[in-house]
Amino acid sequence: MKRLSFLLFIILLSLIPVSAISAQKINPGSTCKVLKQKVDYLDKTYTCTKSGKKLTWNKGVAAKKATPTTTPTPTPTPIQISIDNLDLKGVPQKANDNVIKVLKSSPRVNYEPTKFLGANVVQARVSQEIAGLERAIDFWAPYFQPNKFQVVYVMGGDEEWLETKSLELGLSSMLPRGDTWSMWMKKQNPCAFAMAGSGKGVPTFVQCLGRPYGGGNRQTGPHEYTHLFQDYYGGTNHKRIPWYTEGSAIYFGWTLGFYPTDSNFNDRSNWFKSLYFNMNNESKDDFISKDMQRFKNRMKMLTPGSFDSVSMTSYWVGGLATEVLVALYGFDKFVEFTKNIQTNPDMSSLLKQTYGFDEDYFYEKLAPYVWAHIPL
C-alpha cells in the first residue's frame, strides 16, 4: 500500500508543469521528460508537449522580458519662505519662478522699437541686444506699451554723430546737468554705458555696445526698458528712491537678460559679487559692520555721497530688496507698488500702503538677507 501511494505521488509530480532557464541547447522536436514543463532558452520559451507517445519540445514562443521596476523620482519639497525666513536658496528661486511665469504667459508683442545706429555699430551685436530687449517688451506689455519707443545704439567713434542725433531727438535732458554724450562715451574704454529717458516725449534709451554680449551686459537692455516702465508709472517720484529705481531695474534686467541660461543662478551670484565690489568702501563698510542703524541709513540714502556712489549701492542692495519683495508677494504686487509711487514718494508710507508694513520693519527683516550676500 505504501509503495502504491509513492508511485501515485511520482506520477502526479510528473504532471506539474515546471518553468526553468536551460543551460543546455533546446531543439524543437527533441525529446523532453516532463509534460508541460516550460524552459527559457535564448530568446524563446519552449514547452514540453505530448506528440503521440513521445514528449517533445514545441517550436517555442518569444520570451516575455521582465519589465524593469522604475523607482519614482521624489518631488523636492519646496522651501517655505516668509518675511521671517528669507532662505538664501528659496528666495531667489521663488522670485525667479514668479517672473518667468509671467514671461512665459506673455505672447510675443507685434511691436518693435525705432532703432538709430551709429556708423561704427555692428548689426550682429544689435541683434544680440534685441533678443533680450524683446523679452522685456513682452514682459512689461500688459502694463507698458508706448505708441512709440526708440533706441539709440553707438560705439566708440560715434561721439559726434550722437551729439547731433541728441539735438535732433531731444535727448539732452537724459544727461546729468553739465554733461555731454561725448563725456559719457569716454568714461569707459570700451564704452558700455546706457541711459533711459525721454526724447521729445518719446520713451528712449541710449546704449553704447563697446563690450561683448555676455555676463552683466546681457541685462542692460531689459534694465533700461524697466526704467521706462518706472518713468511711465512712477513719474519723477521714483527717482527719489534710489534703491527702488536702480535696484528693481537691475533685478528685472538680470532675470530677463540671463534667462534661460542661468537655471543654477551662477550668473546671478557672479553678478551680485561684481555689483558689490563696484561700491565705494564707505558703502561696503556700512554693510560689513552689520550694524542695523547704519544699514537703515544706507537704505534711506542718508549718508552723503555722489550720484554714482548712490547708484552703485542701489544696484546691489536694491536688487536684493526687489528680489525679496517679488519672492514673497509676487509680481502683480510689485507693479502696484510702482503705481503707488506716482502719488506717494515716502518709502515708509508707500510700503505700508502696498505691503502692510513700514520702512523700518522691512529693513530689519531684509538686513540679514543682504548681509548674507556679502562676498567672503
Residue ranges and their predicted role:
Residues 1-4:
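Positively charged n-region of N-terminal signal peptides that target proteins for export
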Residues 8-16:
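Bacterial N-terminal signal peptides
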Residues 16-25:
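Sec-dependent signal peptide cleavage junction
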Residues 42-50:
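Extracellular disulfide-bonded cysteine-rich modules/repeats
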Residues 76-214, 218-219, 356-363, 370-374:
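Non-catalytic architectural context of zinc metalloproteases
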Residues 190-284:
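Zinc-dependent metallopeptidase catalytic helix centered on the HExxH motif
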